[in-house]
UniProtKB/Swiss-Prot annotation:
Organism phylogeny: Eukaryota, Metazoa, Chordata, Craniata, Vertebrata
Record organism: Danio rerio (Zebrafish)
Stretch list, region Disordered: 104-201
Chain's gene name: bcl7bb
Family statement: Belongs to the BCL7 family.
Chain coiled-coil ranges: none
Official protein name in the record: B-cell CLL/lymphoma 7 protein family member B-B
Length: 201
């Protein structure tokens, strides 16, 4: 085969795969960030994956437990097709950004078409604790990182003053009491002496 025909075939296969993924994304409306193992390796990445309880999403509101169908197809067949397509693309590193971008564009479309912003925020927000703790084994999500950065910025801006710290009488007294404790035999406290450093160097 010539190089052009191979490239054309690859391009058409890629387009077909993209169409399958886009169709699956349209069916799956709830996504969450999870740690996913890549292929047979021990490499794990943190990426958007569809929520596994998809049968609840496809349940029609008016229908009972009788036969459920979606556009003429049984729901189970549609779910299996969507799962198989998504599983094909979950292990590829190259598709991580594609799925993420596709999800972000879907949320923009959903938020512009929905009249209730509360429903959109419920579907988009991951089910993580509101704050990242150091004992957690997973890193925070993007929203949590920005909240922490804003919180830290607000605390540092409130602590920062325009004037440099000044030495007041209480500080002088505390220095003299420290010297007395050293003379008594108490363990010395660590302090920084700027005058001593400037004379040595």
């Amino acid at each position: 085969m010539s190089g052009r025909s191979v490239r054309a075939e690859t391009r058409s296969r890629a387009k077909d795969d993209i169409k399958k993924v886009m169709a699956a994304i349209e069916r799956v409306r709830r996504w969450e960030k999870k740690w996913v193992t890549v292929g047979d390796t021990s490499l794990r990445i943190f990426k958007w994956v569809p929520v596994t309880e998809t049968k609840q999403i496809y349940k029609p509101k008016g229908a009972g437990p009788a036969v459920r169908e979606l556009k003429g197809f049984p729901t189970d067949v549609v779910l299996e097709n969507a799962r198989s397509v998504l599983l094909d693309f979950q292990d590829d590193n190259s598709n991580q950004s594609f799925l993420s971008d596709a999800y972000q564009s879907n949320t923009k479309v959903d938020s512009s078409s929905n009249s209730s912003p509360q429903h959109v925020s419920e579907a988009v927000s991951p089910s993580h604790p509101p704050y990242y703790r150091t004992e957690d084994s997973q890193p925070p999500t993007l929203g949590q990182e920005s909240m922490e950065a804003e919180r830290e910025a607000s605390t540092t801006s409130s602590e920062v003053t325009d004037e440099p710290p000044t030495l007041i009488k209480e500080d002088v007294l505390s220095l003299s009491t420290q010297e007395e404790e050293e003379a008594i035999g108490a363990p010395p406290l660590k302090r920084v002496c700027t005058e001593h450093n400037s004379t040595v160097s």
